[in-house]
């Protein structure tokens, strides 16, 4: 099957966010961010667990106040996934959450303060073996850079990132990753391209403030897809004005489409037409809902007629080709004698998929099947 990604990843150094490896060929980590009030511990913990259930490798939590920092301490104790504390304006909050076991500190160089304050955060991170993400954003560039460039440009984002990379270099601190996010696709893509040529540290990708669920997913897929196809990127976050759980799903779908990292069922399904012998759209929607718990990578083709069905089935782990009253079933590209009753196709196909998943899982020697 033609399912190996031709993408050659950009070489980068290795850091760890908790127990999650970042860079140097590690699987691209998918993360999201909570949108609850951090001081609402119960709601925040519930959302973090929901994100973890759909595969989040890392979760970022905004910590805007000292009260939020105290809440973060409790949240950290009640969750398992590595947590990144998002810090703006007050560097002392970064020092506080470091005491509470944060797995990574995200600071925005445009508003965290002067170099001495950054130095305090860096020394604390070094002492506690905590990595840092330098988060540059086109919407919060330093005033002098806006005066110089008049508007966010790739060169402005690069200069902002590099001045803070230089600070970390002078402090002999190399456990960091960098992001240069923007809401404009071309601005973000070119900024990342420039940065990728300047440093060896891992890059965290994102199109910031991308929009609602549909438009934001499309914008992120276009922008991040361009970078990932060039081998750029070690972690990613899809920024949607939607349920954060959707960010994780979209993130994995982007990686899955590029054959970089697969998680769960990859459905190959026709848009359907008058030739379909069963309701393709309803079948796919129901199977997606039922099989959300599956993490084992698997290609399943569901085609409503014999025009493209056999060809797609040949390169799928499981294939279904629409037929009159009964549809053809393929396993590993081989047509089986068994045929599926079109009226009960969802139940029959779900059973076959789950049986094959169980068979594959039994052969996998590692517990991390997503890598």
From Swiss-Prot:
Cofactor: [4Fe-4S] cluster
Catalysed reactions listed for this entry: (2E)-4-hydroxy-3-methylbut-2-enyl diphosphate + oxidized [flavodoxin] + H2O + 2 H(+) = 2-C-methyl-D-erythritol 2,4-cyclic diphosphate + reduced [flavodoxin]
Keywords: 4Fe-4S, Iron, Iron-sulfur, Isoprene biosynthesis, Metal-binding, Oxidoreductase
Pfam families: GcpE
EC number: 1.17.7.3
GO terms under biological process: isopentenyl diphosphate biosynthetic process, methylerythritol 4-phosphate pathway; terpenoid biosynthetic process
Transmembrane feature ranges: none
Single GO MF annotation: 4-hydroxy-3-methylbut-2-enyl-diphosphate synthase activity (flavodoxin)
Function: Converts 2C-methyl-D-erythritol 2,4-cyclodiphosphate (ME-2,4cPP) into 1-hydroxy-2-methyl-2-(E)-butenyl 4-diphosphate.
Name the UniProt record assigns to this protein: 4-hydroxy-3-methylbut-2-en-1-yl diphosphate synthase (flavodoxin)
Natural source organism: Shewanella loihica (strain ATCC BAA-1088 / PV-4)
Originating gene: ispG
């Amino acid at each position: 099957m033609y399912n190996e990604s031709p993408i050659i990843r950009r070489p980068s150094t290795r850091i760890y966010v908790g127990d999650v490896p970042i860079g140097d060929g590690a699987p691209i980590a998918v993360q999201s961010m909570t949108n609850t009030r951090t001081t609402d511990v119960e709601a925040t913990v519930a959302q973090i667990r929901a994100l973890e259930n759909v595969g989040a490798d890392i979760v970022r939590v905004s910590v805007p106040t000292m009260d939020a920092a105290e809440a973060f301490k409790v949240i950290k104790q009640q969750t398992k996934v590595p947590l990144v504390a998002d810090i703006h304006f007050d560097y002392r909050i970064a020092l506080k959450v470091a005491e509470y076991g944060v797995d990574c500190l995200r600071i925005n160089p445009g508003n965290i303060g002067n170099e001495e304050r950054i130095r305090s955060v860096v020394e604390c991170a070094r002492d506690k073996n905590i990595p840092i993400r330098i988060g540059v954003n086109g919407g919060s560039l330093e005033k002098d850079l806006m005066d110089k460039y008049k508007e966010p440009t790739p060169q402005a984002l690069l200069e902002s990132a590099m001045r803070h990379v230089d600070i970390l270099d002078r402090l002999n601190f190399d456990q960091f990753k960098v992001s240069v996010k923007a809401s404009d696709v071309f601005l973000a893509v070119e900024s990342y391209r420039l940065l990728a040529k300047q440093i060896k540290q891992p890059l965290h990708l994102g199109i910031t403030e991308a929009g609602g669920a549909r438009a934001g997913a499309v914008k992120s897929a276009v922008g991040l897809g361009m970078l990932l196809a060039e081998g750029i990127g070690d972690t990613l976050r899809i920024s949607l004005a939607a349920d954060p759980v959707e960010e994780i799903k979209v993130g994995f779908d982007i990686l899955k489409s590029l054959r970089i990292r697969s998680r769960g069922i990859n459905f190959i399904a026709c848009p359907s037409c008058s030739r379909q012998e069963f309701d393709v759209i309803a079948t796919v929607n129901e199977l997606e809902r039922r099989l959300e718990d599956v993490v084992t990578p698997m290609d399943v083709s569901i085609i409503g007629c014999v025009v493209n069905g056999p060809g797609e089935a040949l390169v799928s782990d499981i294939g279904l080709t629409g037929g009159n009253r009964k549809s053809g079933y393929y396993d590993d590209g081989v047509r089986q004698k068994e045929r599926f009753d079109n009226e009960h196709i969802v139940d029959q196909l779900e059973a076959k998929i789950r049986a094959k998943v169980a068979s594959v899982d039994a052969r996998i020697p590692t517990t991390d099947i997503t890598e």
